Amino acid sequence: MIARWSAILLLLPIGALAQQKDEIRKSVYFDGGSYYIDEYQVDELYHWLDSIPNILEKFEIQLISHTDPIGGKQYNEWLSKMRGEAVYELLLQKEIPESIIHRKDWGLDNPVYSNDSYRGMMMNRRVDVILHPVVF
């Protein structure tokens, strides 16, 4: 299921994810009610991180986790935290220092996509990994 995200992402309107100037972002997607990251997504994330030269010197990393509204606010706050933690652990395994990783768990608040459709809910089940340039 998750391996099909690449095709789905091609269908998104340009600018669907508002991006700040100079930031670089990648999303890790999840099945409903899950914080499991499949091998395909792990490989995609690691490949993306490896493709960015001098990542540890040039960027700080922000993790922003999201959910769809199914299950209610309290459940989704927990699920969002678990999704953020799962991606955080992958970054630590990649030897990225804790000191440059910052987290925000939104839960079902602030969805980027409409939760009125299955597709929108599917796209809201994610953790955005955002690289912000370090300003000297």
Placement of each model-derived feature along the sequence:
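Sec-dependent N-terminal signal peptides
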Residues: R4-G15
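Boundary of Sec targeting at the N-terminus
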Residues: A18-Q20
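Envelope-exposed proteins and targeting segments
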Residues: I24-K26, G33, E57-F59, S99, ...
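A short small-residue
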Residues: R25-Y29, I64-P69
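Periplasmic peptidoglycan-binding/anchoring modules of Gram-negative envelope and division proteins
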Residues: F30-I64, V129
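Periplasmic OmpA-like peptidoglycan-binding domain that tethers envelope proteins to the cell wall
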Residues: T67-F136
